[in-house]
């Protein structure tokens, strides 16, 4: 196992919304960091994130901070964007955060082509993440019956046989691992 895809909800899904100083957000980020460390100890060196607000951005920032430490210097972060300009309706601070991540990651892949429907691009982006990974870490509530890109990504990873599939609950930050 050498690579991990990351998926998760956008801030509007979380009880704390965009408030990253909220204890729930801090706890979630801490648990994500702990899981990345465990994956690294198991040989994972490449991480794939999708470039969305929320979990994707937080994961990328956590991983870049880890990479600054000599113990994680061989860590590689890959940014996979659904289409060029997917961030055009974001606030400037969020767009700058994305540009910073893109400048510091190993590479950026843009999935969609001009004229392609955005929804199709998001689905193809999620498939790309899974297709390039050995395991998946998803911030996802499997008990809620909401339709989401994260849910689709988890189910696609199950069909593809990724293992482990690590689920971090978006409200409690509890961690569970789906069995094959």
Question: Where are the regions that the model predicts?
Answer:
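Acidic/glycine-enriched connector segments
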Residues: 1-179
